[in-house]
Amino acid sequence: MNSKQEKLAAFERLLDIMDELRAKCPWDKKQTFESLRYLTIEETYELGDAILNSNLSEIKKELGDLLLHIVFYAKLGSEKQVFDIADVANNISDKLIYRHPHIYGNLKVNNENDVKKNWEALKLKEGKNRVLGGVPKGLPSIVKAQRIQEKAAGVGFDWDKSEQIWLKVQEEITEFEEEVSKGDLKRSEEEFGDVLFSLINYARFLKINPDNALELTNQKFIERFDFIESKAKQLEKKLSDMSLSEMEAIWKESKNQSSSPDSNNC
């Protein structure tokens, strides 16, 4: 791997390229914080895909794209004479040192949970006077629910056992079924939200990432549906002309293939 000096040289090279692009490239010269925002979100999701696919080559590539965005934002900040990349790096370094007193101070912790609780306590001391105030409003709903639950748990508002949460899940499902039977769409939607929130909480307790779990299922469904499409082409049929029973038979074939010992599919 590269030495520390080589890493610093590579980062300096990126900074120099950013300066030159900002000065000479018509596209780069036009960019603002606002215009880059949606591109940054897209790059973040592409990194997430690479991680889920365990593709180290793509992870490296997508990390580079995100690093470019960080450098770009810092360049924009420096042009406004508000902050530069050194300020960004020093700010996060200061934060890490402050929030890790068990490493850089005298605080004693026994486990990971102690670290998380102390982290949230320090955030409150910093002026973030609401525990859930730091959860971004724009987070995807599943991720937001997980972060809400983690932050609440960080100050002791949590269940003792996973069995308690599972009972809560069953309770919420019963309430949802009752509203569905009444035909009340608004109340059904609310209760369905409660079911999802409880399931996400149960997953958290089991140390399952619910967003990752759902995305793996999404990918599995896509692969199996692609299999149906491929089979339909082999049979010279359109999906719209196939019966549900025909498609279900091919679906089962796909499941059998993906569960075989020699298969690497989901």
Q: Residue ranges of each PLM-predicted region?
A:
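Flexible "arm" and connector segments at domain edges
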Residues: 1-62, 68-192, 196-266
